Amino acid sequence: MSKARITYKDAGVDIDAGNTFVKLIKPLVKATSRPEVLADIGGFGGLFSLSSGKYKNPVLVSGTDGVGTKLKIAFLADRHDTIGIDLVAMCVNDIIVQGAEPLFFLDYLATAKLYPGKGAAIIKGVAEGCLQAGCALIGGETAEMPGFYAGDEYDMAGFTVGVVERDKIIDGSSITVGDKLIGLASSGLHSNGYSLARKVIMDVMGLGINDTIPGLDKSVADELLTPTRIYVKSILNLLRDFTIHGIAHITGGGLLENIPRILPNGCKAVVDKTTWQVPEIFKLIQNAGNIEEQEMFRTFNCGIGMVLSVPEKEVEEILIRLSGLNETAFVIGEIAKCDAGTECVEMV
C-alpha cells in the first residue's frame, strides 16, 4: 500500500494563496514608489539609491515598531484596512523627531493562515501610511505560521530608514531654558495604552466592539481604530524654515516618559495641563476606570502626539505655519531650569 502524499498546503502553508496575495498588493506597493527605488517587490532585497549628489554628509536613521494590542480591536471588528497606517506611523514618527526624512519602509506580517484579500487590506493601510509619510514601501515578509497564532489572528512589525544631514540632527542638546513647548494634537489613542483602554471599555464598562461609546456618538471600533496621525510632512516643512531644538514623539509612556528622552541636563519641561482640551475618550477611560491623573499621563498621549521645543521668538510664526498645514497646535509649556534629583516633567 502506497503512502498518501503530503503537501505543504496539507501542513497549513498555501503557496498559491501567497502568490495571489503578492499579485493583489503589487499595485499598492508601486503607488508608494520614489525615484530612488530601483526594483519592484519580489526580489531578495529592496534596492534604494541614496544619491551622492543630494546630500553632503548624510546620516541614516532607522526605526522599528509594532502596533501592540490595537490589533485586538482590528480582530474583533474584522476591520484591517487602517491598522497598517498605524504601523507606518509608529515607525516614521519616531525617526522624524531626529530630523530624518523617511526614505523607505518594510513590513513583516505573520499569521496562522493567509487570506489574500484580508492580507491585501492590511497592506493597503501600510501603503496609505507610506504615502502620508512620503516614503516608499520597498519590501516585506509575509509568514504563514499554522498553529502559532490563535484562530485568524496575526502580528505585524514595521521597519523604516530615513536620512538627515549630520549637522541637522535633532537630539535635544540645543534645548535651552526659556524654550516654548508646542504640542501637536493627536487623532486619538494612536497606538499606545490599548491594553488599559480595552480593560476599561470592554471589561469595566461592558461595551462590545460595535456598541456606541456613551457621550461620543461613535462605536468602540470607530473610536479605537482611528489611525495614528503621521506628522512627517508637517515637521519636515517646519524644519526648512524654523529652528527646532527638540522633538518628542508621545507614545507609550505618555508625556511623562517621552519628553525626558530629549531633555539635556539641567532642563525640565513645565507643562500646563489647561492649555489644551483633552479629548473625551481619555476622560471617559479615566473616569470609568478610576485612573489617577499621573497614570493617565504616563500611559496615554492624552491628546498630544508630538511635542516641539522651540525658541520663544519663533512660536507665533510656527503656529501660523502649523495651522496652514492642518495641524492643531497648542503652546503647552516651557523649558525651565532643573535641579539635580527633581522630576524632568512638571505638570501644572
UniProtKB/Swiss-Prot annotation:
CDD domains: PurM. It is found in: Cytoplasm. Its main location: cytoplasm. One of its GO terms (biological process) is adenine biosynthetic process. InterPro entries: PurM-like_C_dom, PurM-like_C_sf, PurM-like_N, PurM-like_N_sf, PurM_cligase. It is an enzyme of class 6 (ligase). Its EC number is 6.3.3.1. The keyword Cytoplasm applies. Keywords: ATP-binding, Cytoplasm, Ligase, Nucleotide-binding, Purine biosynthesis. One of its GO terms (molecular function) is phosphoribosylamine-glycine ligase activity. Pfam families: AIRS (PF00586), AIRS_C (PF02769). Coiled coil: none annotated. One of its GO terms (cellular component) is cytosol. Pathway: Purine metabolism; IMP biosynthesis via de novo pathway; 5-amino-1-(5-phospho-D-ribosyl)imidazole from N(2)-formyl-N(1)-(5-phospho-D-ribosyl)glycinamide: step 2/2. It catalyses: 2-formamido-N(1)-(5-O-phospho-beta-D-ribosyl)acetamidine + ATP = 5-amino-1-(5-phospho-beta-D-ribosyl)imidazole + ADP + phosphate + H(+). PANTHER family: TRIFUNCTIONAL PURINE BIOSYNTHETIC PROTEIN ADENOSINE-3 (PTHR10520:SF12), TRIFUNCTIONAL PURINE BIOSYNTHETIC PROTEIN ADENOSINE-3-RELATED (PTHR10520). Belongs to the AIR synthase family. This is Phosphoribosylformylglycinamidine cyclo-ligase.
